[in-house]
């Protein structure tokens, strides 16, 4: 099965959402009459203010696969609580054999993350973060692991509500 990785491409549409294509793979289905070629695209969409979504599209041609992936990403968006352009706290995410460590960073640090994780943080609007991946570097699994970690983010107000305390008690 032949594989083809595309460079990460960015696009901003009129609705204010940022779109990035992470990868395009050429896939082959072998049938009695020969081979059937197709394409699978992986994309992320964000609003630059903490909302993020991931989509995967499959089709016989690349533009159709990318369009399907973008539409799915828009449907799967969720909100991540950010604090001054970075994460609230350190968090671990896992999907399959991919594991990621996501940590907040001081202002001026920038996005220190590799490959597909960088695209996720760019479209989400995170300016300062440190991220490390362990295990599998499959782009699909890395994006899913990153989103798993981002879903685990909680605000001080959430923690205070769970513990039955005030936000001031939680923050010290």
From Swiss-Prot:
Residue ranges constituting the S5 DRBM domain according to the UniProt record: 17-80
Alphabetical list of SUPFAM superfamilies matching this protein: dsRNA-binding domain-like, Ribosomal protein S5 domain 2-like
PROSITE patterns the record matches: RIBOSOMAL_S5, S5_DSRBD
Any one GO molecular function term: structural constituent of ribosome
Gene Ontology BP annotations: translation
Any single Pfam family the record assigns to this protein: Ribosomal_S5
Cellular compartments per GO CC: small ribosomal subunit
Keywords per UniProt: Ribonucleoprotein, Ribosomal protein, RNA-binding, rRNA-binding
Subunit structure: Part of the 30S ribosomal subunit. Contacts proteins S4 and S8.
Protein family (similarity comment): Belongs to the universal ribosomal protein uS5 family.
HAMAP family in the cross-refs: Ribosomal_uS5_B (MF_01307_B)
Description of its domains: The N-terminal domain interacts with the head of the 30S subunit; the C-terminal domain interacts with the body and contacts protein S4. The interaction surface between S4 and S5 is involved in control of translational fidelity.
Main function: With S4 and S12 plays an important role in translational accuracy. Located at the back of the 30S subunit body where it stabilizes the conformation of the head with respect to the body.
This protein's name: Small ribosomal subunit protein uS5
Organism in which the protein naturally occurs: Burkholderia cenocepacia (strain HI2424)
Lineage: Bacteria, Pseudomonadati, Pseudomonadota, Betaproteobacteria, Burkholderiales
Gene name tied to this protein: rpsE
């Amino acid at each position: 099965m032949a594989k083809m990785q595309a460079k990460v491409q960015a696009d901003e549409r009129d609705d204010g959402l940022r779109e990035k294509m992470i990868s395009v793979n050429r896939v082959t289905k072998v049938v009695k009459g020969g081979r059937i070629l197709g394409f699978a695209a992986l994309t992320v969409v964000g609003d630059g203010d903490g909302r993020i979504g991931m989509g995967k599209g499959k089709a016989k041609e690349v533009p159709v696969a990318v369009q399907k992936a973008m539409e799915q990403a828009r449907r799967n968006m969720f909100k991540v609580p950010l604090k001054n352009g970075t994460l609230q706290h350190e968090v671990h995410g896992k999907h399959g054999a991919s594991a990621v460590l996501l940590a907040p960073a001081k202002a001026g640090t920038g996005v220190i993350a590799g490959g597909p994780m960088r695209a996720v943080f760019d479209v989400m609007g995170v300016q300062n973060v440190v991220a490390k991946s362990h295990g599998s570097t499959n782009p699909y699994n890395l994006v899913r692991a990153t989103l798993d970690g981002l879903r685990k983010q909680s605000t001080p107000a959430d923690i205070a509500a769970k513990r039955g305390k005030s936000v001031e008690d939680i923050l010290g």
